[in-house]
Structures are given as C-alpha cells and as structure tokens.
C-alpha cells in the first residue's frame, strides 16, 4: 500500500528533532576561599559532579529539556570552588512513536546540550582562577536507566 505518491505510509513522515533554542537558565560559580584557594595545591583536589535532566512539555511537540550540573572541588576540608549550571534547550519533536518519546527527550536532547554546558563550566572555572574543568562525557543512557530504576523503586511514574 502506498500513500498516493508511491512511497509507503511509514516513509512519508520521518522522525524529526529540531533545536529551537538553547540558553543558560542559571549559572553560579563560587570561589569562597580566594585568594588562598588559588595557591598551588599539594595534591589533586577531589571533584564531585552531580548531573540531572528534567523536561517540561511546552506545547504540542515542543519540550524544554534542562541539563543541571553541580560540582565542587575540595582539597581536604577546604572548598576550592563550586558551581551550578542549569542549561536548557527547546526541542521540537515530531513523528516519533509515543513509546520512544520519553527516552528521546531524556537521552538525546541532553546529549545535544552537554557540549555547550561543558564549555560554560570550563570557562567559568577558568575565569575563577583555576585550570579549566573539562567534564568527561556523560552516559545519558545509563543516567536514564538509573533514574527509571529509582522512580520504580519509589513507586513513581518515570
């Protein structure tokens, strides 16, 4: 069966993911012990990073996805620096089956946002007087699965 122009119906409307906007929602960098924290350290600081993804349905086929990244660098009990970034994008997603929509929003959209968020953090840390912090790539599939498991254990919908 064809749709009148010789193509099968499923080929008539390919899935589409468009980035409509990207923006910093919130950015905070703290260097609470400067200038002492800028002195050379005896050892590598311990760096703790937390990453979360959130999404809101703005309109039919349009979603805001927010990538939240928080981090802290400590040397012993001294905080060298800390940061928080909420970086978001508005995405238009059409012709995607409903069962694939949630994973697409929570995996692929943050994967597209991450390089930009990484650069913002690297620049903020550098501008704070430290070497740029280059975040390692994030396994958004693993993060998605982890969040699904946590939601199921708590009896919440994903």
Swiss-Prot record:
GO terms for cellular component: cytoplasm. One of its GO terms (molecular function) is unfolded protein binding. It is found in: Cytoplasm. Gene3D superfamilies: SecB-like. GO terms for biological process: protein folding; protein tetramerization; protein transport. Keywords: Chaperone, Cytoplasm, Protein transport, Translocation, Transport. One of the proteins required for the normal export of preproteins out of the cell cytoplasm. It is a molecular chaperone that binds to a subset of precursor proteins, maintaining them in a translocation-competent state. It also specifically binds to its receptor SecA. Homotetramer, a dimer of dimers. One homotetramer interacts with 1 SecA dimer. Belongs to the SecB family. HAMAP family: SecB. This is Protein-export protein SecB.
């Amino acid at each position: 069966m064809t749709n009148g122009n010789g193509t099968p119906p499923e080929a008539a409307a390919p899935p589409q993911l468009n980035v409509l906007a990207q923006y910093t929602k919130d950015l905070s960098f703290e260097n609470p012990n400067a200038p002492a924290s800028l002195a050379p350290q005896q050892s590598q600081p311990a760096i703790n990073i937390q990453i979360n993804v959130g999404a809101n349905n703005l309109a039919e086929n349009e979603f805001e996805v927010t990538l939240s990244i928080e981090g802290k660098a400590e040397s012993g009990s001294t905080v060298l620096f800390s940061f928080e970034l909420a970086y978001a994008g508005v995405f238009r997603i059409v012709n995607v089956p409903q069962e694939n929509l949630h994973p697409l929003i929570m995996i692929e959209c943050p994967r597209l946002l991450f390089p930009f968020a990484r650069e913002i953090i690297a620049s903020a840390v550098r501008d704070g007087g430290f070497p740029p912090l280059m975040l390692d790539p994030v396994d958004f599939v693993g993060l998605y699965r982890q969040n699904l498991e946590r939601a199921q254990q708590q009896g919440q919908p994903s």
